[in-house]
Amino acid sequence: MAETKKIKTALVSVFHKDGLGELLAKLNEEGVKFLSTGGTQKFIESLGYECEKVEEVTTYPSILGGRVKTLHPKIFGGILARRDNEGDQEQMKEYEIPSIDLVIVDLYPFEQTVASGASDADIIEKIDIGGISLIRAGAKNFKDVVIVPSKAEYGVLLDILKKKGAETDIEDRKMFAERAFGVSSHYDTAIHAWFAK
């Protein structure tokens, strides 16, 4: 198996919680540590699993009515750091940045909000910033990180975990990265179409 990587820490930031329970149960069984924010963190804890708050890592609260939660160097550094790069690893130690091996995201439902006839203000609030940034960061660093970019992929990761435990190979991670850029491309195309109408 080429370039196998162990999943030790998962950042979970999702809008839709349905279908997440079984995946979290398997990750917990494999000893994976959870990191999350807001509603997702409460959901994880409601299932009986320990979950570290993103705010505890960043030492910065969620601000601007929840518009800024995960956008912080300690989170993005943990995703983007190259595990085989000595300079990156030294900086992670220096700035106490934790490695994040798995990112699970489910974006704000922009298209559904538009289709519901919501106001422009409500539609704008459903333009995901942190989530799309997490998707791009995880996909860019697929050499080291697994990115699950939507609830449609929960089952795909669950199947891998059932077969291999909390390990993935480079082919798995590249497949998720391809799907991630597909999700981000579709999402931004929908936003562009709304602005262009």
Where do the language-model regions lie?
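N-terminal glycine-/serine-/threonine-rich phosphate-binding loop
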Residues: 1-57
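Internal alpha/beta core interface subdomains
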Residues: 5-8, 97-197
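Short, basic, glycine/proline-bearing loop/turn elements
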Residues: 6-13, 73-80, 120
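Glycine-rich nucleotide/cofactor/substrate-binding loop typically near the N-terminus or early
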Residues: 39-109
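Structural motif
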Residues: 2, 27, 92-95, 137
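Short acidic, glycine/serine/threonine-rich loops at helix termini
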Residues: 22-24, 45-49, 56, 63-66, ...
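Short glycine/serine/threonine-rich phosphate/pyrophosphate-binding segments
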Residues: 19-20, 87, 132-134
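Conserved residues at beta->alpha junctions
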Residues: 14, 83, 148
